[in-house]
């Protein structure tokens, strides 16, 4: 498995968790999810529950939202 790109969700969570001084266990407790979920999220596991991802992001004042994807015919 390759390292996550700097703009990825996994990188965001790992970076913010470390900056806050949280262990994976502490972040999981704050978000109401298990340490294993935090580990899976930080490793970009492709099958994560969005409701649980949003619980983790809420600790950092964020949420997943919809944005328009660029179209192939746009410059």
Residue ranges and their predicted role:
Residues 43, 68-69:
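Short, conserved catalytic or interaction motifs in soluble domains
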